[in-house]
Amino acid sequence: MASIAVCPGSFDPVTYGHLDIIKRGAKVFDQVYVAVLNNSSKKPLFTVEERIELLREVTRTLPNVHVEAFHGLLVDYARSKKANAILRGLRAVSDFEYEMQITSMNRVLDENIETFFMMTNSQYAFLSSSIVKEVAKYNGDISELVPPVVEQALKRKFASTAAD
């Protein structure tokens, strides 16, 4: 049986921290579905389509990584992909409590789908999409935080916002 994982997130925008988890997951699992969600509790900077495009660009050298949008319950999406795992990145202990609640709920919904936590590389432990957006908004240097294509997309996005 193939090992198939779903790596969910809003990826608004994708950072080197996200990419670290995706690349490492691609070494462990036969197939990884990066599931881009539209979180209604967050106001995204990039549309789902833009986030998918950026993710596809930065993962194009990973043949076993697929990027798609999803809505609804994560376990339903995982089942639709015949996934037996959910892959989640952890930056710090503070992430764990929230992730544990989500994992426990997912186990109630489908006990056959396991959740795997991967600690992000220590150089990205502080990194979040929110921090990246805040630094980019004020023209700070984000070149060590996101891939070049994402850096350019952020510059365009904030240039157009400033022009409005």
Curated annotation (Swiss-Prot):
Biological processes, Gene Ontology terms: coenzyme A biosynthetic process
Binding site for ATP: S10, F11, H18, G89, L90, R91, E99, Y124, A125, F126, L127, S128, S129, S130
Record EC number: 2.7.7.3
Keyword check for Ligase: no
InterPro entries: Cyt_trans-like (IPR004821), PPAT (IPR001980), Rossmann-like_a/b/a_fold (IPR014729)
Cellular compartment(s): Cytoplasm
Marked site positions, Transition state stabilizer: H18
N-terminal signal peptide: none
Annotated Gene3D superfamilies: HUPs (3.40.50.620)
Catalyzed reactions per annotation: (R)-4'-phosphopantetheine + ATP + H(+) = 3'-dephospho-CoA + diphosphate
Family from the record: Belongs to the bacterial CoaD family.
UniProt cross-references to PANTHER family, sorted A to Z: PHOSPHOPANTETHEINE ADENYLYLTRANSFERASE
Name of the protein this chain belongs to: Phosphopantetheine adenylyltransferase
Species assigned in the record: Geobacillus kaustophilus (strain HTA426)
Name of the encoding gene: coaD
